[in-house]
């Protein structure tokens, strides 16, 4: 039996009107807002990125991708760039876009300045080398581990050699 408890603010993901795909009904599962992104070029990965942030994940990730592709930003610049968000009501702007507030208000938008939109984005660019980036919105940091990809004979448990496994299988 369910408890009736909805985690975080996920009730906003449901439609309050009956008879629709996301209408509130007993036993309905909470939709999620996960959006790990891969950007491909010629079927090869160019960028991978993701972040926490509920409903603000999708537009935040897309803004970073637009910044990378259309505005030629570096990976670090793209994940740290100021963000904008709306769900049809007021427009939220991070402080870095505060200069846009009067223009948006002149167009009839209600604008709210906020310290951050979405969570701390992390990203990787793939090329001759891999480059990582983490933004200021969270305590994330870039960490790289060397050693190359796993090869035949490489095991997670150093005390168990491949020969031990073969002997056990044959025994």
Model-inferred region functions:
Residues 1-117, 158-160, 167-171:
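Proteins synthesized as precursors that undergo proteolytic processing into mature forms
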Residues 102, 106-171:
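In a subset of proteins, long, contiguous C-terminal domains/tails are tracked
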């Amino acid at each position: 039996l369910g408890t009736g408890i909805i985690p975080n603010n996920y009730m906003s993901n449901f439609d309050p009107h009956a008879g629709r795909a996301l209408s509130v009904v007993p036993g309905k599962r909470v939709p999620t807002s996960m959006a790990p992104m891969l950007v491909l070029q010629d079927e090869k990965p160019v960028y991978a990125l993701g972040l926490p942030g509920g409903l603000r994940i999708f537009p935040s990730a897309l803004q970073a991708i637009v910044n990378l592709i259309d505005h030629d930003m570096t990976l670090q610049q793209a994940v740290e760039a100021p963000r904008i968000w709306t769900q049809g009501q007021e427009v939220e702007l991070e402080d870095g876009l505060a200069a846009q507030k009067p223009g948006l208000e002149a167009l009839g938008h209600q604008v709210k300045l906020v310290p951050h939109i979405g969570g701390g984005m992390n990203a990787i660019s793939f090329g001759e080398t891999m480059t990582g980036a983490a933004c200021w919105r969270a305590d994330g940091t870039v960490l790289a581990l060397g050693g190359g990809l796993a090869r035949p004979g490489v095991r997670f448990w150093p005390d168990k050699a491949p020969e031990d496994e073969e002997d056990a299988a044959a025994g």
